[in-house]
Design a protein with these regions (language model features):
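Alpha-helical membrane insertion/targeting regions
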Residues: 1-244
């Protein structure tokens, strides 16, 4: 009952809080390893097994809220003539890809946890999917000229900034840069799909139909899936002969 009746704003705040916690953990992990606090790095790293499912569940919850809001909008008199409804439909590609990219980076970080360069880059990749939303919110909030533009402009600038950062990091060490290429590719797909398939009128009701899914079941399924991803990444990354 509580899950189904939390406001959309509270769900977004829950998602934002989980993102902040994940980012703080990434900073702590970077600090501990750079100061040779390896034991502390390993102990605090165990928090990822709590925060990863939390963040993924929050992300899927936001997608369900967006689909529900879109379904309501499509039933209104304005429908797709309302730009907000069109944007919600477009996010039906952006947000799922962000969740998939985050999960892929997390899985890679566990799989390559004994290969320092790859492990660090995969784990850094998990937080790169928040760059574009931060940039476009700052642009819309603090740059008057951009504030008056259609949303697709700051959205594209945010994505291009994030892609540029990913490619810059790749160029610093191409030998170990595969995670950043993956991040850049996923972000490019987010931008392209947002501006192409996301604008097709037939897509809007398809995404809105996600709201028909039972929310508690969807969140439980996401939680189970996240545990499976973590378990698989941990097992495939185990050293030969070491207990998994």
């Amino acid at each position: 009952y509580l899950i189904n009746h939390l406001s959309a704003q509270m769900v977004h705040q829950f998602h934002a809080a989980s993102a902040v916690l994940w980012t703080v953990l990434a900073i702590v992990q970077s600090w501990t390893i750079h100061h040779d606090r390896i034991s502390l790095h390993r102990r605090t790293g165990m928090a990822i097994f709590l925060l990863f499912p939390l963040f993924l569940v929050a992300g899927v919850w936001v997608i369900h809220v967006e689909a529900t809001t879109l379904a309501t909008g499509l039933d209104s008199a304005t429908g797709l003539s309302d730009s907000e409804n069109v944007e919600l439909a477009q996010f039906g590609f952006f947000d799922p890809l962000a969740n998939l990219g985050y999960a892929l980076m997390f899985w890679g970080g566990l799989k390559y946890r004994y290969k320092v360069h790859l492990h660090a880059r995969y784990m850094l990749g998990t937080i790169m999917f928040v760059i574009a939303p931060i940039v476009w919110r700052l642009l819309r909030g603090y740059v008057p000229m951009i504030h008056d533009m259609p949303f697709s402009y700051p959205f594209a600038l945010g994505n291009l900034t994030a892609i540029g950062i990913a490619l810059f990091l790749y160029a610093q060490a191409p030998k170990h840069g595969r995670p950043f290429l993956l991040v850049a590719g996923i972000m490019a797909a987010q931008e392209v799909l947002f501006e192409t398939l996301g604008r097709i009128p037939a897509w809007a009701p398809m995404f809105a139909s996600v709201s028909d899914m039972n929310l508690p079941f969807l969140l439980i399924l996401t939680g189970i899936t996240s545990i499976g991803i973590a378990w698989h990444g941990w097992v495939v990354g185990a050293r030969p002969g070491a207990p998994s």
